[in-house]
Amino acid sequence: MPRWTFRAFAVCCLIVTGAACSNDTASAPAAYRDAGPFEAGVTTIMLADRMVEVWYPVDPGDDAGLEPDAYFIRDTLPDAFDAILPADVNPPFVTDAYREAPASDEGPFPLVLFAHGFASYRNQSTFLTTHLASWGFVVASVDYLERGLASVLGQPPDPQLEDTALTRMVVDRMALENERPGALLEGRISTERVAITGHSAGGGTSIRFGGEPDVVTYIPLSAGFPSDSMVELADKPSLWLTGDIDGVVEPGRTINAFEEASTLSAPARLVLIDDMGHLGPSDICAIGESGGGIVQIALDAGLPIPESLVRLGTDGCQPEALPVEDGWPTIRHFVTAQLRWAFGVDSEPVGLSERAAEGLPEAVFSYQESP
């Protein structure tokens, strides 16, 4: 597999642990569970009729004087629903990124695409996207309006775009942003080779886009692969991650997809997290927790939410489920480790094994790898 390196790894060695960084990192069972050597910046760019949220590395200290960025799920609602909600029903989610902070000049950094799920929005997994930026990746997440929250609630886009075509448009848009004189991310993005991860329906996007020639790895989260699908799994390195109480995408579907990927020549990996539900790889359960969660807040405010969306919007948030914050370190570590290995930042896999459990006490999980 071709290998790709960037100067940020040298920064990691200097900032984190000195000259012994590579040895210490390689020996750590869960080296990437915590934030990396960079801060995370965030900016929003336009792509036709929709927005792309972009997270990127920021040198330590360059976030001075800035407040952590927050987003509001209410901003993604159709106008008709927004008009029903009282003005004070608008819980923020505070992220680990700083808006418009100056981008580190230690790049260019590899591009990772994130695809959100059904009835969701581009910011849905900032717990992960900001983390990846701290480890030296530029992460771009577009609004897949065709399956987004506003569309599901009655305000679809016109025209509608096919998901993989839209994903390619994001790559092209990021390449232009990299070349635009004076742009915040000028010279900071490498788009020659990319990776993609996605949640639920976005995991399906990652599978379909994974066959593109410039993709080095695809990482479906809480997603499966129908046995009767007309799409063939790409013979590319893959990481499949889900929870064993997922009531939306039955875990067996993810396991079957991993087993199908295991018949190919490229490495396939599976992480199955005990007691994690469908929304574990997202911010959603953590939004408005004090009010019973975002769905309960909406119901209390009188929003007419279909029962199917109530189930989708609460799976993994129930009291018996693993608290989502306890699952995040495991998700962060394995996704980061897979990306660093696939892009060649780590010449050998770091923490892609059962041994990672030694550094991830918050959650219990099983790990498989093939071949």
Where in this protein do the model-derived segments appear?
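Active-site-adjacent alpha-helix of alpha/beta-hydrolase-fold enzymes
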Residues: 233-326
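Domain-level recognition of soluble alpha/beta enzyme cores
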Residues: 24-112, 289, 300-324
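Gly/Ala-rich beta-loop-alpha elbow adjacent to hydrolase catalytic centers
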Residues: 198-202, 206
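Alpha/beta-hydrolase active-site loop
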Residues: 124, 156-191, 208-210
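C-terminal motif of bacterial Sec signal peptides marking the signal peptidase cleavage site
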Residues: 17-20
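A conserved short beta-strand
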Residues: 142, 214-225, 269
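Short substrate-entry loop that stabilizes the transition state in hydrolases
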Residues: 92-109, 114-151, 247-251
